[in-house]
């Protein structure tokens, strides 16, 4: 299968799924997705990591994931580039979360269902109004917390709403996300890094 060059990457769901499915020839979609998210998260985190042991541990995890993904970094790197391009084209979306649900990877045993991004955006628009704007002006920072963050749609939509309302979210807002599922937590981490929202990459 020919893999497109960076110049040809458009950042579409079809692009991502075509390449992703190529990795699923001998493994389940869940196994491939899990290793892909781990590899992406390790790549991002180690750019900023200063602790040698943690950096080495992530390198080992990255190498294991790439081996499971076929041993070639080309396709995982292209998939990461597609995600980045998709968010450059339209930062106001939950690119990975939408693909995750399209691939039926959600766990109904955990009650896992990703709220559509448009619903998250509507909630952000309702919540972030004059009161929040005034608090942001009066305080050192305000916090947005999601204790079941999934791929980060609530946090990303909040960041985009702050930006639209003229609030300097990079200096005035602390975004906190957590989830019981490590894989979706990594999805959130990757999207927050590649989206125009502030991040603490620890």
Residue ranges and their predicted role:
Residues 193-202:
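Single conserved hydrophobic/aromatic residue that forms the stacking wall/gate
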Residues 188:
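Conserved SAM-binding loop
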Residues 175-178:
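Conserved SAM-binding motif I beta-strand of class I
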Residues 181:
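Conserved SAM/SAH-binding beta-strand->alpha-helix loop
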């Amino acid at each position: 299968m020919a893999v497109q060059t960076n110049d040809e990457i458009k950042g579409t769901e079809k692009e991502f799924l075509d390449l992703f499915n190529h990795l699923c020839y001998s493994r389940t979609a869940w196994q491939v997705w899990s290793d892909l998210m781990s590899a992406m998260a390790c790549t991002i985190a180690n750019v900023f990591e200063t602790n040698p042991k943690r950096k080495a541990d992530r390198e080992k995890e990255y190498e294991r994931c790439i081996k499971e993904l076929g041993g070639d970094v080309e396709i995982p790197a292209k998939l990461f580039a597609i995600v980045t391009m998709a968010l450059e084209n339209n930062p106001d979306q939950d690119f990975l979360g939408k693909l995750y649900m399209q691939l039926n990877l959600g766990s109904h045993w955990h009650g896992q269902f990703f709220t559509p991004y448009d619903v998250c955006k509507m909630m952000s628009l309702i919540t972030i109004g004059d009161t929040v704007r005034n608090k942001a002006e009066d305080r050192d920072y305000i916090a947005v917390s999601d204790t079941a963050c999934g791929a980060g749609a609530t946090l990303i939509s909040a960041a985009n709403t702050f930006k639209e309302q003229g609030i300097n979210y990079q200096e005035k807002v602390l975004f906190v996300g957590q989830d019981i599922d490590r894989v979706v937590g990594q999805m959130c981490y990757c999207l927050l890094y590649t989206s125009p929202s502030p991040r603490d990459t620890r």
